[in-house]
Amino acid sequence: MTSRTAVKAPGVVSPSRPRRGLARLFRPAWIPILRRTKPLSGVWGWDRGAPVDRYYIEKFLDQHRRHIRGHVLEVGDSRYTGHFGSGVVNSDVLDISAANPQATIVADLALTDALPESAFDCFILVQTLQYVFDLEAAVREIHRTLKPGGVLLCTLPSVTRIGSRYLANDFWRFTPASARGLFRDVFGAAIEVTSVGNLLACTAFLAGLAAEEVSETKLRVSDPYFPLLVTVNARKSSSPEAV
């Protein structure tokens, strides 16, 4: 009896090894996450490690740490002032609530003359402006409270969940174009706006994964079509005639 040897065409999966390799290839650990209707973490991944957005926030602040000096204002607490600052002479913490024991200034950022004028060399504003309805007023107040030559280091969410305490006052998401227009109207040309993140980073962040659970090589990829957050480095003019 003549034996016949089966010839496997290039690219065809052998019947003796049906699709197991393909299943492993196309069913990564992400698939169960993508089938969920609720995230793995309800607090942006804080209970699993550092949230994915913090990876980008800390990279941005590290890149501009030379500006975190002199008299520094930060919102909520002074963690980034302490971690990235050098030559910090005075540190203030801004909060809208007097219940925050770390707050040294209790004020609404969107109110005119809420903050001391020309007081700060650096203002660290991390993931805050989405909670301020009157953005134009807030940016004017930020500009007013900086010293001439003072620097704003700001991060803005492009993709994020709404926190359980913020359903009533989470107003905005940002793109580089919207951030550029918002800050250019007040700071003029002395702004640098960038976006960071990609599809994988956005998916992981919304799913509640921590940054430690995602490959840093992939987190480093920036896709302008899938920004996770927007960063703004804005300098107040040293000229007293500047807006």
Predicted regions and their residues:
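A C-terminal cap/extension of S-adenosyl-L-methionine-dependent methyltransferases
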Residues: 4, 10, 63, 89, ...
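Class I SAM-dependent methyltransferase Rossmann-like catalytic core
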Residues: 16-66
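Acceptor-substrate binding/catalytic loop of class I
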Residues: 48, 163-182
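Conserved class I S-adenosyl-L-methionine
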Residues: 67-80
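A short acidic, Gly/Pro-enriched loop at the edge of an enzyme's catalytic core
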Residues: 107-123
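A short SAM/SAH-binding and catalytic strip from SAM-dependent methyltransferases
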Residues: 121-134
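A short glycine-rich, Lys/Arg-flanked "PGG" loop and its adjoining helix->strand segment in the class I
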Residues: 136-151
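Acidic carboxylate diad motif detector
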Residues: 154-156
